[in-house]
Amino acid sequence: MQGPSQLALFYFANGLPPDDIQDLFQRLRSQSKTESGWTLRAFVVQATNALREEIRQLPHHLRNPLTPLDNALDLAVVPDWRRGPLAGALEGVLLCLIEIGSLIAYYERTPDPFKFSARTACFTGIGTGLLAAAAAAASPTLADLPRLGAAAVRIALRMGVLVAETSQSVEAREPDAPADNWAAVVMDLDEDTVREELNLFNASTNNLGPSRLFISAGGTDNVTISGPPSKLRQVFRVSEKLRSARYAQLPVYGGLCHAPHLYNCHHWTWIMEPINGAAFNQNMVDTAPLFSAGDDVPFEASTPRQLFESVVCDLLMGMIRWNRAVDGVVELLGQTLPSECQVYAFRPCAVVTGMVASGQVKLPHCQFQTHDLLGWTCHDDTDNGPTCREDSSIAIVGMACRFPGGANDLNQFWDLLEQGADVHRRVPADRYDVESHTDTSGKSRNTSLTPFGCFIDQPGLFDAGFFDMSPREAMQTDPMHRLALMTAYEALEQAGFVPNRTESTHLKRIGTFYGQSCDDYREANAGQEVDTYYIPGGCRAFAPGRINYFFKFSGPSFDCDTACSSSLATIQMACTSLQHGDTNMAVAGGLNILTNSDGFAGLSRGHFLSKTGGCKTFDCNADGYCRADGIGSIVLKRLDDAQRDNDHIFGIILAAATNHSARAISITHPHAPSQAELYRDILTRAGVSPLDVDFIEMHGTGTQAGDSTEMESITSVFSPGVPKRSRPLYIGSVKANVGHGEAAAGVMSLIKVLLVLQRQAIPKHVGIKTALNPRFPNLDRLNVRIPHDQVPWPRSPTRKRYALVNNFSAAGGNTSLLIEEPPVRPEPKADPRAAFTVAVSAKSKASLKNNLRSFLAYLESQPSISLAHLSYTTTARRMHHNHRIAVHGSTLSSIMQELEPYLPAVDTHRPVPNTPPSIAFVFSGQGSFYTGIARQLYEHHPGFRLQITRLHNICLSHGFPSFRRAITGDLSNDGSEAEPIITHLTIVCVSIALCRLWETLGVKPCVVAGASLGEFAALYAAGVLSASDAIYLVGRRAQLLQELCTPNTHAMLAVRATVEQIRNVLAGQPYEVACINGSSDITLSCSVADIINLQLAIEQHGYKCTRLDVPFAFHSAQMDPLLGPFEHIARGVTFKAPNIPVMSPSLGDCVFDGKTINASYMCNVTRNPVKFVDALETARGMDLVDAKTVWVEIGPHASYSRFVGSAMPPGTATIASLNRNEDNWSTFARSMAQLHNLGVDLNWHEWHAPFESELRLLTDLPAYQWNMKNYWIQYNGDWMLRKDGKSSAAAASHPHQAIPPALRTSLVHRLVCESVQETRVEVIVESDILHPDFFEAMNGHRMNGCAVATTAIHADIAFTLAKYLYSSIMPNSTDAPAINVKNMQVQHGLVARKDRSRPQLIRIRGIADVTRGLVSLSWHLVDEQGRRVEESFATAVAEFGNHEAWLEEWSPMTHLVVSRIDVLQRLADDGTANRLSRDMVYMLFNNLVDYAEKYRGMQMVVLHGLEAMANVTLAAPEQSGGKWTVAPHYIDSVVHLAGFILNGGNGLDPRRNFYVTPGWKSMRFARPLVPGVRYQSYVKMMPIREQSGFYAGDVYILHEGQIVGLVGGITFRTFPRSLINTFFSPPDTMTHGGSQAGSVHQPACSERTLPVGPARQDSAARETLCQGHGLSRTVMDSSDSSPATTLTPPTLPSVAASTESPIVHRAMALIAAETAIELTELSDETAFSSIGVDSLLSLVLAEKFTAEFHLDFRSSLFLDCPTIGDLKAWLIDYC
């Protein structure tokens, strides 16, 4: 305790204490987490925020090592921070953190008060320690120190950055070189002697500018010398006195301080720029004095800001004289006469010991006692009490969704809500067969009691290539995981996420949090055939893990299951993670895709689900909820981070919490008091009154218990009656629209609320179908409203809008979020830039085309959009891909005009390579000067202006005149007023500033070249010269030029000719070759007297020449007088080895070493000819540059780009930095667009950062357009109903057994008998073709007015029996086999009788051969007693296969089929082929077949002779009716194009003949036929040579460009039309002895087998893959406009076939098979990572390779050979 007779003296050192720094910081961290450490905690938080703000503004290469910065104390563990360019700055920051933090901790742990006055304390220190001392001295109380301490930390960083940059301009540090000393202390010499030696050294070495050595500190027996490290070493070598004295290098690594010749008021003004605000400008009253290290009087300051300012000025420009500071402190002690002096320091040190000794001598009456402010760190008594953490609000900055009812984006979702849609429907066929899996009575085992749900359309759609997944992996990966990936990307895209752009987007600090409560796809779909990706594709943990892996997030990934509240509970986890600092950004959401009937069965039998349809939330007849798909993703950040990052904020999560209804009557029953407690907790945390919440999105499932309980809890808190609400409380539930998304329900509700806030309207509630639930309280009295129409909810200027999202779980958990509307942002100011770059990119050509198309449509619809915002969004706030287009313009219309030509050319647009091109910098010379160089950049780009200002200060420090007028345009337009020193300094300084600007933007050279004056800037760029030395040499040379050379006595002439040509023309005339810029571009120098004669002679010989407007003839004899003096000057400059190669035009060579470039070389730069083309050719020969190198010209005008273009191969890219007569912004916008299109990884953030506060992120731009295919494993059969393992095919002898559900369909009615043996299973079934379902199927295919069985009916029966028999053979299998119905032969047509009063029966016999895996099928006519009328009228064989193998087999022929479809389309466009509408097609078809509506799937047909294609859309489920395995009307719709060609086309004569099919060779569907989906059919019918009147062809069925079905060898036979009555009449009306059972004989075909395919069989595609080599097949050119004569599968690429070895072919086939990728897509450039060959698939491939080639292959082979080409080369070399 200090009394009146005590004085406290605080000393703040300039160096880190000798302790283990990391240990000290760890102890500070521990203290900050204690209950008593709240002040230290506040300091750390404020210091962290200050540092983050400063680090954000650093260039990327300086910023990257310091991010992410979660806590300022983490800087102590930055790797190798002492070796980096900011070593000095970081040391200053760490020193301030330790000294201020330890001071706070000391006073937190002791009873001594932190309160000082001018009479009780004084402060002093040295170096950066003075900043910490200033913060302490200016703090009236300990509570004020965190704010002022954070300011000191910020100042330390800014000053360190300034000192480092200024010092680097004086002498550049070599990359990766150890830190060098900028100061040395000399003992035993007085200050005058040392100064005399330094002056002598500086003068003798021409070192009189910024790099001169100087005295920075003086003491009684020592002097400190500061200066560039190389000069310091040199002076101790050449000065005898200094060399003889005792001296030591000081650990000063950050650069030069205490240097008045380097710094001025502009520097400290910049340092103090952010130190503003009331706290820094309050008057200080009776504060303790602060003594500098150079004076005996304290700093004079009345505010904290002034005190900091004085300290900064002293550190930059004041000299250290510590003895004077000690005298001042002792004098103060003498004035106050304390009896005790308590001296505080950070560890004992010699300085404190000396100061105490001096005080004891002069004040013997005063007792001195020292205290160690770090002493507390030695005690292990840290209070480990609870930490008080301040909650942070969480901003939602991005969102995306896939919701039922076609709501595949936010706009569609809002439209659905606005329209009040209820999108529930019957379970679609792509999930499971709703008929067989639903029994509303509940009697059938494992069936659902409800057929209803809400479903996402085509959830299998996915862009596998975008996410580097093979089709095989994509197929096996749960669609929840896949849609999570796509929605995560869309949400991140909307959030403007770019990896590592800011502190909060650093990949190390991003986590994913998703809720998921079921694994339907893994259990019901992928589980049918367990494969390589069954685990990573289906297990829940892989959903968020896959997102982390793809985006390279290193933060946590969590998959959470809390049943119905999973997504909202997981979002709360994400908020907690953000608030605790575990992450800086989070991607969160919920996932639910329903494919497993078990969930429906269990929930409906548990009385959760409605049997009558959708969720009737709030309705009196609410009877349960309706299950729903749902995928939602959101992006979260801390609010301050989001605002700092310039994000668009959709809403703010003020508070989130979860509790449990532990007191409920059962685990599934909600509990109102528990829910109410949760709401109150959240409101208390947020500090919001419940009466201020205007909208609540309730859980609202539509259950009686749930709705009434939730309404009770809501009204009890938010509308209790007393006090009465002044504004209505609106409530609603999205489940009435889109169902209950279960694990995704919470994120569904949250996204709805965010849209409500954005659209400023509450959509109507559609859950009340009859009347309000009577169990609810009187809502009108409570002022609670359920919106029956849309209600406006606009922003208010006086109050904020709040909404609550409520979610509870069937397992008892309750989760709620309180949402606040986003903050209002002021209107942005106009952007000063005159032109902008806009970019569009994608990972595939298809996506690029669609992205471009949607982007242009957006621009067309938004003519008033800000071009600045558009540029910012599409460049700085987008992840860019290899397929890219960037354009520039000054208006929106010009941008559209630039983009539109790319749209038709996308297919030929080449992607940029994965490896960026090399960059070469070319610095142009003095011939390009004009006034106003870089004027717009200087006026409006802060970073560029700062660089020019600092370079200008260097010029002034060298004694050179100001060159600013040349930039601001105050000189005459042609620059004639400017002296050479002005023009030369301007060019070199602008070039250096441009070089730094390009490097800040990520454009860094691998080689540099400079022409004439440009070589000085080039040497700076290569690290040979510092900026100061480059400026010094240029300025001194210009001065010598003015002093020793007479202007306008010599001239220069640019000539378009070779040196040899001019030598012949000017033989004997006086001239010199000054520049050889190209083979036919040279410059001559001569006297003015001779220039006219030279020009005339040259022009007379037909060569073009131009006289240059320059006052001196450089690189000529005119330069000779200045060479000697200039070399003498240059010897005083430090030359270093280049960091990158230098193309030297003065040598015509390339320089790598540190000896070539010296003072003599600089004279050569002035005198020798510029041999630019020689230097360039040498660089090409050394492979320093090549045709792909991008040349960036740096200088006032792009004068050398033409020379580069002429010397390099055609197409070489040249980029301008500035252009005469063009706005700087236009030049840069164009150049950055060019660089981006060339694949250069630009740092767009840095380009927009100076203007970002006035830029806005456009969140309504079209989302990425995916290149999707439907990856879907269809659940087949009904094995989910029979999981007990018992076969339903028990042996039986009864003629009519109860038919199993799996066998009963609309076409199979009764089980006659079933026999099961060891290797054989037989089943006989019976069907009545007059049964309503069967007859309806036949009656939809009417011929000659009769109901005739289409062969598709027989196909469906075949599929049904084959699938049933497979389950009998494999009773324990969960696999759904692929079935090929082969060799279908129909001998007799089947026509229904007119008399339907009695049955008309057929029986079908199926015999399964277990050993061969085949099922033989035969159809028989029987009478009513079951007796056969005759032998079989149809036969077929069913063979079991593999869906994926079929797709792989068909893949090689896909492009051929598609190309033929395209040809037909083009023929139709030009009128050569016929394009027929749906009505026209079936009108023509009607001359033979009258199809019912559900059979009429062909929507359009293009017909050309016997070749045709059709667009097909299958009938909707409500039209279909019945129960089918593969519905006959679906089969017929995709296949009967073949029959239409013959019976409705113009290739044959359908008036005389008709054509019917007796069968086909094979019928396979690799994907289920799905209603509503668009398919394409293609077939070319060909006559069979061997059999007159027969035609055959292959019908290809395609979906989204992929062959998904193939009916191979479908055959038709010709019959005279006169026989149609004979063949197609009802059997009971026939008079010529027709069969009583209803068969109709086909003439001459019952006694023999018909050919069922053309000469080529569809197995040829499989042969292509299996043979692997030696094939010789014909591939049609898709550009051929004539119909093909044959359709054959594609071969392997012709080049490969001719040059590759058989082993390569086999390897490629294996890879194609395992990845499910077409062989044609496996180019040499294909990276294995891009086609999904990960560690798992590598193991599989290695195993397959080993088995195939009988060699030992390791999975690491695909790491060693990352591309297909690499693998091919390896196989050729080693196999």
Swiss-Prot record:
It comes from the Eukaryota. Its EC number is 2.3.1.-. Residues 1309-1621 form the PKS/mFAS DH domain. Residues 1472-1621 are annotated as: C-terminal hotdog fold. Residues 1698-1775 form the Carrier domain. Residues 29-258 are annotated as: N-terminal acylcarrier protein transacylase domain (SAT). Transmembrane segments: none annotated. Residues 391-821 form the Ketosynthase family 3 (KS3) domain. Residues 921-1241 are annotated as: Malonyl-CoA:ACP transacylase (MAT) domain. GO terms for biological process: endocrocin biosynthetic process; fatty acid biosynthetic process; secondary metabolic process; secondary metabolite biosynthetic process. Induction: Expression is positively regulated by the transcription factors brlA and laeA. The modification O-(pantetheine 4'-phosphoryl)serine is found at residue 1735. It catalyses: holo-[ACP] + 8 malonyl-CoA + 8 H(+) = atrochrysone carboxyl-[ACP] + 8 CO2 + 8 CoA + 2 H2O. Residues 1305-1626 are annotated as: Product template (PT) domain. The active site is at residues 564, 699, 740, 1341, 1532. Pathway: Secondary metabolite biosynthesis. Residues 1677-1689 have a biased composition (Low complexity). Residues 1672-1694 are annotated as: Disordered. Endocrocin is specifically produced in conidia. Endocrocin and related anthraquinones compounds have interesting activities for medicinal uses, including anti-inflammatory activity. Disruption phenotype: Abolishes the production of endocrocin. Leads to attenuated virulence in a toll-deficient Drosophila invasive aspergillosis model. GO terms for molecular function: fatty acid synthase activity. Residues 1309-1455 are annotated as: N-terminal hotdog fold. Non-reducing polyketide synthase; part of the gene cluster that mediates the biosynthesis of endocrocin, a simple anthraquinone interesting for many biotechnological applications. The pathway begins with the synthesis of atrochrysone thioester by the polyketide synthase (PKS) encA. The atrochrysone carboxyl ACP thioesterase encB then breaks the thioester bond and releases the atrochrysone carboxylic acid from encA. The atrochrysone carboxylic acid is then converted to endocrocin anthrone which is further oxidized into endocrocin by the anthrone oxygenase encC. Multidomain protein; including a starter unit:ACP transacylase (SAT) that selects the starter unit; a ketosynthase (KS) that catalyzes repeated decarboxylative condensation to elongate the polyketide backbone; a malonyl-CoA:ACP transacylase (MAT) that selects and transfers the extender unit malonyl-CoA; a product template (PT) domain that controls the immediate cyclization regioselectivity of the reactive polyketide backbone; and an acyl-carrier protein (ACP) that serves as the tether of the growing and completed polyketide via its phosphopantetheinyl arm. This is Atrochrysone carboxylic acid synthase. The lineage of its organism: Eukaryota, Fungi, Dikarya, Ascomycota, Pezizomycotina.
